Structures are given as structure tokens and as C-alpha cells.
Regions:
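Residue-level detector of functional hotspots within protein domains
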Residues: 104-105, 111, 116, 241, ...
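Internal nucleotide-binding/catalytic subdomain
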Residues: 223-225, 280-283, 288
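Nucleotide/pyrophosphate-binding catalytic subdomain
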Residues: 1-266, 271, 362, 436-438, ...
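Residue-level detector of flexible, active-site-proximal loop/helix-junction positions
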Residues: 149-151, 288, 428
Length: 474
């Protein structure tokens, strides 16, 4: 039986410089099974588009943006006429369409979620053209494809859509299999698909990892490679803990928890389609392709109860909702959490007592969150207090929920550094515990927890790494 094909996803920094295309081509030609390539937008492009649609712009600003996007993408094209001219024609058509779209937004001074998603999709659309042209220049028979055209189907939740797995499989798989059988390498846009209404819907920022896993699910492939300009997961952020070391394997749940709570090497939603397809996610460093990286899959579960990694999220705030008998008012927690969710506010953690419900949210959203909670109908609501300058620390490992004494070791190590723990959360997941500290205490707390569990390895850890993963949100 022939070996199965693979999906290889390349992040924004991997497609942002001309010299990177030599590396991408080498990755693909070294292993011809890497037939399906999923790409992010070139680094910085989506940020520029987001800035543009947050507030309608004047025509002069739109002209400057379109000019800059065109120059950036054209500067990355190969020089040979055939590959260059074909890509230029398509890029011109894309930038013209984007320009007209932004003029329309400026004229009406409003933008719907559907229109916003369509605008944001242009980063990946342009990137796919540039990547495919460069791969053809280097001998790879690459053909660019737009995900919403070839069959990546989603629900109608614009801005944070979810792929419809079975519908995507029935539409996407036959098309891509024909492309591969014909010898083509498909370069597919990440980040978006087509909604049930026939409109472009995005998966949220960083959603190209998720796209790659969806493509693998549709094709029933066992391996999704996530190529970035950094390594895989580490035991902690090496910027804070110099002794941090690389992790060769994680379970699905461990990877999802670490990604959600600050480790930015993988989008947390990428785990869902990988798990559904029983596939492995392999995080690879494009600068060190021979390194093992981190494998996440069905065969990497280690339930020893050991702590595997520590991640964190900065710049949070705790909202404390005081209410008489809060703990016995079952509907109050539900109503408050639903109100925050409906307002698009991410809640990292929640805890309740007899007199108070506490929510952990981004500090940038705390004012909005306070207003939202203030409108929750309740005859028992007393007051709302804000505790600013909070950071969340998460420690992860399969089987932690069954291990004895792990939490005690963590909090003892933190207390010995004079750090006060504010909000503790355990039990929602059997693989992760979280707690909050004041932001000024974050770094010493992370170092203390890491030393508590990994001090025995410090003598064996090299003084430096060829590359390090940015393990946390900054």
C-alpha cells in the first residue's frame, strides 16, 4: 500500500521573505508526500487589513494601503517571466477587488461581519499566489486554490466560523485528490472557507493551523505538519526560563490547553479536526527541518501525572460580581457568562462563592465586560469590582487530576517566592490547573514552578537553542 499524502502548513513568517521560498521548496521536494500546502497571509498583512476595517478609512488611506500591499507581494515574486506575469495578473485582480470593496465600506461608513471576513481573506488569497509562483520557479508543480472556492465549508458564525467536516470532505476531497493524482501540489488558502450562505467566513486569527487540520480530515490523512520560524512546544517560555527545553510529544488535550492559555505555537482549535480524524499534528521549525519538533496525536498520551509545561497569559483583569447568595442563585452564573459570551468577551476562568462570582477577562475588555454585567437582570446584584494587572499561569500534564500533591507543590513553590495566588481553577480539565497572580509577580512565579518540577534537568539543558518558541502571549 502506498504511503499517505501529508498536509504541510506554512505560517506568515515563513512566506514573508524571498529566501524563505528556497526553504519551503526544499521541505516539499525532500518529501514528495507533502502534496497539500496550506498558507497563512504574509506577516503583517492581516493586521493591516484589520486596522482598515475597524474604522472606515478615507480614500487616500485606502490608496496607500492598496499600494503597499501590491508592492509587498510583487517584491516577493520570482523574476522569470512566465511565473511572474501570471501571478502579477492575478494579484492585480485581487488588489482591484479589495480596493473597490474598501471604497464601498468608506462610502457607507459601516461594515457587516460578512464583509469584514471577506476583506480579511485577501491576505491569504494574495499569499497563495505568491507562494505557488515561487514554488513553480523552484521546480514544484504548484497550483494556488482559494478555500471557499474548492469546498472548505463552514457555519455562518462570521469572524469565528467552524468548519463543517463531513460537508467539506464530500466537496473538497475529490477535487484535491484529482489534483494530486495529476502531479500537482495544491497551495490552499488558510484562515477561511465558505459559509452556508455562500459567503466567505473566517476561522478567527491564527486560523490557518485549523484550516490545515480540516484539509487533512477531509482527505483522511494521518499527518499535519505545521511549519513555522520557531520550534515546537517547550516546557516554558525560554525568554523567562532560560533552562526551558523542547517537548517531543504532547497529547491532544495537553496541546489544546497550552495553546488556549498562552502558548502561541499552535492554534488551539487545530486539535479538534486532528482528533476527529485520528491524525497527528507535527510542529516543525523551517530553519531546522531535521529536528524532531513536537508531535501531538492519539499515540502520545502519557498519564503519569507529571507536569509537562507551563504557559501564561498576561494583561488580564478579574471582575468580581458581588451578589447576595450568589452561590445558590444557579441562573446568575449562567446569565452572566452568557451575557459576556454574547458580547464577544473571552472568559479565561470563572469561580463562584456564596457572595461573589469572579470572571477573568482581557484587560482591554474589562470596561465593556463591566457594562455588560451591569445590565444582567438580577434583584440580588450588589456591586462589581475590578482587580487589574492580573496574569494567568497554567501548568499542564495528562493525569494531573489523578496525581497527588501536584497542586500543593506548585503553590508552595510560588509562596516561597512571596507571590500571592489570587484565583485558582481546577477540575474543569483533568490535564490543566490555572491560577492568577499580579502581573508584577508573573515571571518569578513561572520560574519557581518550572524549577520545582524540572530542576533535575537543569544541568543537562544546553545554554542556548538554535531557535526558541515564543511560548506565551505578550
Amino acid at each position: 500500500m502506498a504511503e499517505p499524502w501529508k498536509v504541510a502548513k506554512f505560517g506568515g513568517n515563513c512566506v514573508s521573505r524571498p529566501d524563505m521560498y528556497d526553504r519551503i521548496a526544499k521541505v516539499l521536494t525532500t518529501d514528495p508526500l507533502r502534496k497539500f500546502v496550506v498558507v497563512s497571509a504574509i506577516a503583517g498583512v492581516t493586521d493591516s487589513l484589520v486596522t482598515t476595517v475597524v474604522k472606515p478609512r478615507e480614500e487616500k488611506e485606502i490608496d496607500l494601503l492598496i499600494g503597499e500591499l501590491r508592492r509587498k507581494h510583487l517584491s516577493l515574486l520570482p523574476k522569470s517571466r512566465g511565473n511572474h506575469d501570471t501571478a502579477v495578473e492575478t494579484l492585480d485582480a485581487l488588489t482591484t477587488k479589495l480596493e473597490r470593496l474598501l471604497y464601498g465600506v468608506a462610502y457607507t461608513e459601516e461594515i457587516t461581519p460578512r464583509t469584514k471576513d471577506f476583506v480579511l481573506s485577501f491576505g491569504e488569497r494574495m499569499s497563495a499566489q505568491v507562494v505557488a509562483a515561487n514554488l513553480r520557479e523552484r521546480g514544484v508543480d504548484a497550483v494556488p486554490h482559494e478555500a471557499d472556492v474548492i469546498g472548505v465549508m463552514t457555519d455562518d458564525n462570521y469572524g469565528n466560523a467552524t468548519a463543517l467536516f463531513d460537508e467539506t470532505r464530500s466537496r473538497l476531497a475529490p477535487f484535491l485528490e484529482r489534483q494530486a493524482d495529476a502531479g500537482h501540489s495544491s497551495v490552499i488558502t488558510g484562515f477561511f472557507g465558505m459559509s452556508q450562505e455562500g459567503k466567505t467566513a473566517t476561522f478567527g486569527r491564527g486560523g490557518s493551523d485549523y484550516s490545515a487540520a480540516v484539509v487533512a480530515y477531509a482527505l483522511q490523512l494521518p499527518t499535519i505538519e505545521i511549519w513555522k520560524d520557531v520550534g515546537g512546544f517547550m516546557s516554558a517560555d525560554p525568554k523567562i526560563v532560560p533552562e526551558a527545553f523542547s517537548l517531543s510529544a504532547l497529547s491532544y488535550d495537553e496541546a489544546a490547553e497550552l495553546s488556549y492559555f498562552g502558548a502561541k505555537v499552535l492554534h488551539p482549535r487545530a486539535v479538534q479536526p486532528a482528533r476527529a480524524g485520528n491524525a497527528s499534528l507535527v510542529l516543525k521549525n523551517i530553519f531546522e527541518p531535521s529536528e524532531v519538533g513536537t508531535r501531538i496525536g492519539p499515540d502520545t498520551v502519557d498519564k503519569t501525572g507529571d507536569v509537562k509545561s507551563i504557559s501564561f497569559v498576561r494583561d488580564l483583569a478579574t471582575l468580581k460580581v458581588f451578589a447576595s447568595g450568589a452561590g445558590s442563585k444557579e441562573s446568575l452564573l449562567s446569565e452572566a457568562a452568557t451575557a459576556l459570551s454574547d458580547a464577544g468577551i473571552n472568559v479565561y476562568s470563572a469561580a463562584t462563592s456564596q457572595t461573589c462570582i469572579a470572571f477573568l477577562v482581557d484587560s482591554s475588555a474589562v470596561g465593556h465586560a463591566k457594562n455588560v454585567l451591569g445590565r444582567v437582570p438580577s434583584d440580588v446584584l450588589d456591586r462589581i469590582e475590578v482587580l487589574p494587572h492580573a496574569s494567568l499561569i497554567c501548568f499542564v500534564g495528562e493525569g494531573l487530576g489523578y496525581a497527588h500533591g501536584i497542586a500543593a507543590r506548585v503553590f508552595r513553590a510560588v509562596a516561597e517566592k512571596g507571590v500571592n495566588v489570587q484565583l485558582i481553577s481546577a477540575g474543569a480539565s483533568m490535564v490543566a490547573y490555572t491560577f492568577t497572580v499580579e502581573t508584577k509577580d508573573l515571571e518569578p512565579a513561572v520560574r519557581a514552578v518550572h524549577r520545582e518540577f524540572f530542576a533535575h534537568r537543569y544541568g543537562a539543558v544546553a545554554s542556548g537553542h538554535a531557535s526558541v518558541a515564543p511560548h506565551s502571549a505578550t
